[in-house]
Amino acid sequence: MPRRPLICVYMMSNRKHGTLYIGVTSDLINRAVQHRDGEIAGFTATYGLKRLVWYEQHETIVGAIQREKSRKKYKREWKLNLIERDNPNWDDLLEQLH
């Protein structure tokens, strides 16, 4: 049976407490692989953000987009606290999703 794509808000980083990117996707695994492999030009490729360090699943893409917009307004400290709470070692969560 094929896997069901995960609709998520997610954060990528290059290292613990490094540069952060917040995005939204309707297929988290595919998108994280694209970031890791450098297939997406732009901010994540420029800064080498290849590690999926946080994600939050949503039922709809509309809900995920709304959450992404609010998360992007968060201060950096709040974003770091989200990651530290759910992923204190800043592991690459893509490995757990495969």
Give the positions of each predicted feature.
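A short, polar/charged loop-to-alpha-helix boundary motif
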Residues: 77-83
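GIY-YIG nuclease catalytic motif and its immediate N-terminal context
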Residues: 1-57, 62-69, 86-88, 92-98
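Catalytic/regulatory signature loops of cyclic-dinucleotide turnover enzymes
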Residues: 72
